Regions:
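Conserved beta-strand-loop-alpha-helix hinge of the TIR/SEFIR fold
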Residues: 1-20, 83, 123-170, 249-267, ...
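Alpha-helical scaffold elements adjacent to nucleotide-binding pockets in ATP/GTP-utilizing enzyme cores
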Residues: 47-54, 93-94, 121, 147-151, ...
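Acidic/glycine-enriched connector segments
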Residues: 1-3, 278-378
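Conserved BB-loop
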Residues: 1, 38, 93-123, 137-143, ...
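C-terminal interaction surface of TIR/SEFIR-family domains
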Residues: 4-7, 11-100, 165-289
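Short glycine-centered, acidic/aromatic-flanked micro-motifs in structured strand/loop junctions
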Residues: 78-81, 107-109, 135-136, 296, ...
Length: 378
């Protein structure tokens, strides 16, 4: 196994003996994840958290040879209301857990250097962090909570909302929407399982956010997206669109999936064209004169570790192919039976969903019955 700048490895020690592999060879001097230290009930969550964090570090951070890991770790900004106990106590528990791992953190005034302005320091940290908004009953009504959300949105930072309402909030802050949300119990102390769920969602959203941005920027560099098009990593929001339009942008590209026409209708009033790479109105009729056949075989029998091909891969491929061919007015031809969870059913489901999404009847699927006929054993 030869490692390089483009082929990296994160070794995992199943037991203490596994650490011995770090004394020589390609794994020499590499730090191992120690799975034997993870408690039994939470082992799966800890594994996901640890591996997702390494994917973030090696995928989106420039790591120097002498980097000890801490400076390339994800930075998390815990945003919470001080009023009431739920938000504050949940934030303290998350803070304590983060402090025991290799994730840098920023936690209210505890990280603000003496002599620095409070608001300037908060904004500075938000600009380089993933914001975790701990939504207690008082959260949406607090001035600084609103400012922290708006600052994160302004600087296109990843955001996770944590729903821990005890009773209710009288008004949900509009800018706090359009982001992933994790629900946890308002009871204190928050469980380690819920902390792990929050942190896993935080890291996965950070990876998604950064990957989407880099992917769209690459598409733009290849002229698949116009150079005068703004790139954003979430579906567009009215405050953001107004700012972009004021800066001269009339076109906006955001990641898949595209918004339903009813949700995106307000964009037409601002005369802004917002689209995803595969859902551009300019290509709506690109395949109107084509009848396109799809032929997909079953995946090899066996487990994932042997063939490195999960059964879901082919299902998703058939869905994606059908979705984008149909969206461009193509007629999809497929030969198959309508067995439960079969590829034909998946393609028909996509056609039905697409009719609703595009609000049109111009969706065509031709299914030619396969021979021999499929007969269920049951």
């Amino acid at each position: 196994l030869s490692l390089s700048d483009t082929f990296l490895a994160v070794p995992i020690a199943i037991d203490r003996n596994g650490l011995g592999h770090g004394s020589e060879g390609s794994l020499k001097n590499l730090n191992f994840l120690r799975s034997y230290e993870w408690s039994g009930d939470l082992k799966e969550q800890r594994a996901i958290l640890a591996m997702a964090h390494e994917i973030y570090r090696y995928g989106f951070v420039e790591i120097c040879e002498n980097d000890h890991g801490k400076c390339s770790s994800i930075k998390i900004f815990l945003s919470h209301a001080k009023a009431g106990d739920t938000g504050r106590l949940h934030a303290e528990s998350i803070y304590q857990f983060i402090d025991s791992t290799n994730m840098s953190r920023f936690f209210d005034a505890t990280e603000i250097s003496p002599g620095f302005k409070f608001d300037e320091e908060i904004i500075k940290h938000i600009k380089e962090s993933t914001l975790v908004a701990i939504g207690s009953d008082a959260y949406s009504s607090r001035y600084w909570c609103q400012r922290e959300i708006l600052c994160a949105k302004q600087h296109q930072r990843p955001i996770i909302a944590v729903d821990c309402l005890h009773d209710f909030e009288d008004r949900v802050f509009p800018a706090g929407s359009n982001v992933p949300c994790v629900h946890v119990s308002p009871d204190t102390p928050i469980s380690q399982s819920d902390i792990l769920r929050i942190l896993i969602a935080t890291i996965l959203e950070t990876i998604r956010h950064l990957h989407a941005k880099k992917s769209l920027e690459y598409y733009q560099s290849q002229n698949w997206i116009d150079n005068d098009c703004a790139i954003i990593s979430r579906p567009p929001e009215i405050r953001q669109v107004i700012d972009l339009k004021n800066s001269g942008k009339q076109k906006i590209c955001y990641p898949e999936p595209s918004l339903y026409s009813e949700e995106a209708g307000w964009l037409s009033h601002l005369e802004v064209d917002a689209f995803t790479p595969l859902w551009n109105k300019a290509e709506d009729g690109a395949f109107s004169s084509f009848r396109i056949g799809i032929s997909i075989s079953d995946n090899p029998v066996g487990n994932y570790s042997e063939h490195h091909l999960h059964a879901d891969h082919l299902k998703r491929l058939s869905q994606d192919l059908a979705r984008h061919l149909l969206a461009r007015a193509g007629t999809v031809i497929y030969g198959g039976d309508l067995r439960k969870d079969g590829f034909t059913q998946f393609i028909l489901d996509e056609a039905i969903a697409l009719k609703t999404r595009l609000n049109t009847d111009n969706i065509h699927v031709e299914n030619h019955l396969a021979w021999p006929l499929y007969v269920s054993d049951s």
